[in-house]
């Protein structure tokens, strides 16, 4: 009887051990390979010189800057593939200080940091549990961002929020004021932002709504600039193209807050869009 009980207990313990091993098994990092359409000649352009670059040449250029902003089109899977490739390749040249995301807000930071600490030992976490643990906003489709988020959470450098919380946006909309600064407050900048907002809403907004939404757009840009400047360097920010552009976005706020700090801008853009040196330092063209 004792032997049977002992055997049964050993079996139970073995099952438990196998369960624990299964829950903490290491997930081998995926080696991201760029689609051939992304590596063809003339896909990447140095906008200061007009010369074409290879992906590796671009990475080497970006790695020289303490701060890099990458602009994306949120619903283009090629753009997310490029972002995954960048965070895979840039640390091979120099250590990465931090990565910041427009898709994360301050209220998520505690959960993100906790999960990131846990994932340093590469435990298996199901997608549903992971999204819940970091309170992922479903407005950013997980099928687009999930692979990038998993990579960043398993990386040794901090993954940081760069956007406003919903409560901050609601307060700003109800109590609009103005951004302070020399570059970001130029009339042409605010006019371009306003026209972009009007166009994206089909001209259906009132003048008051446009003013409020322009302020919120600039408030988001200011927060991203502050977050980028406060992050450990080298720092990399992923955001939408309108936030990334030198013409109206985060780089102007960096100039206002820290005129002596340098930043490089890469905009990932669909073929057919016009991107020049006024918008970015580099452009990487992709299919739609």
Predicted regions and their residues:
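Bacterial N-terminal signal peptides that target proteins for export
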Residues: 2-11
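Short non-domain terminal segments
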Residues: 4, 16-17, 280
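Bacterial N-terminal signal peptides
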Residues: 11-22
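Compositional signal for N-terminal targeting/processing segments
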Residues: 23-288
